[in-house]
A protein has these predicted regions:
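Compositional signal for N-terminal targeting/processing segments
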Residues: 1-294
């Protein structure tokens, strides 16, 4: 499918990157970026609709909430049209009622994690903290989220390498929480206003780092689910549409977990060479300690 799309629309930026293997195509987008032209995604819809009656119809994985993988009524369709942008939004709207082999792979609601709207609200609250009292409710939300990660530990144990990443993330998160509580304790013993303001900034920075770690581990749950599906269906033609950050992490893990060849392309069909083996952002500093060997 990728070759046909690039040939038809070589200069239309509908997606950011694509990962290809023999029977896997993974498309990465910038979430909620308004499409200037839906031609690429229209082509994808046409391609899949031609395949929907085939015995070997491709499986379509969309980064859409697993608990919201269908429309209950016409009002839901109308509301969905009004809210959201991007290729995944377009594909879900056009295919969910007609294409039989769709799986929604964003399990974050199902696992009890924060919604994207809740994450943005929490991030904004942290950014606008002006007193130490405002730190506590934000910390409590992140502490509860950390407990939820622990409750869901079995979810991450399906593949050893993926589980090791989960454990290192949890370890670093716990260290961050311990450090944050220590900083709050130090703040309580400060007497001068100037020193308190300086320490409050340090507390905010530590709280924000904890937020990023929680957000990244929540996002990682999507990677785990997609990778599990790909590994358990080695002979099935599968198209994946997800955020670009998911694409890079999935690409990284598939290369070290399988002996299959995967190539990374940009939206112009040019091969992209990855010079770093770092699958996570700067906030996950323990990645080097993980033994990725099988």
């Amino acid at each position: 499918m990728f070759e046909q799309i690039i040939k038809a629309y070589p200069n239309v930026n509908g997606f950011m990157n694509v990962v290809l293997s023999d029977n896997i195509e993974i498309y990465g987008e910038e979430h909620n970026e308004k499409l200037s032209n839906t031609s690429i995604y229209s082509k994808i819809v046409q391609f899949l609709n031609k395949k929907k009656l085939s015995k070997n119809q491709p499986l379509l994985l969309l980064e859409h909430p697993s608990l919201l993988c269908k429309f209950q009524n016409k009002n839901e369709i109308i509301n969905f049209k009004r809210h959201g942008n991007g290729g995944i939004h377009y594909l879900f709207l056009k295919l969910i009622q007609s294409y039989p082999s769709i799986k929604c792979v964003d399990t974050r609601i199902e696992l009890g994690y924060l919604l994207a709207l809740q994450e943005r609200k929490l991030q904004n609250s942290i950014a606008h903290i002006q007193t130490i009292e405002e730190v506590y409710p934000c910390y409590q939300i992140l502490s509860d989220l950390r407990d939820q990660f622990k409750i869901n530990e079995d979810y991450y144990t399906k593949h050893d390498i993926l589980y090791r990443v989960y454990l290192e993330n949890m370890k670093e998160m716990d260290e961050n929480m311990k450090q944050l509580l220590h900083l709050i304790s130090q703040y309580q013993n400060i007497k001068t206003k100037a020193a308190k303001l300086k320490k409050l900034k340090v507390v905010k920075d530590s709280l924000y780092d904890l937020f990023i770690k929680c957000r990244d581990l929540s996002s990682y749950s999507v990677d785990v689910y997609i990778i599990s599906i790909l590994l358990h269906n080695p002979d099935r033609k599968i198209f994946v549409f997800c955020g670009n950050k998911h694409l890079f992490r999935i690409f990284f893990f598939l290369k070290i977990m399988t002996d299959r060849k995967f190539q990374l392309f940009n939206d112009q069909g040019k091969v992209v060479k990855i010079t770093t083996k770092k699958p996570f952002g700067e906030h996950f500093t323990n990645w080097q300690k993980i033994d990725y060997s099988i």
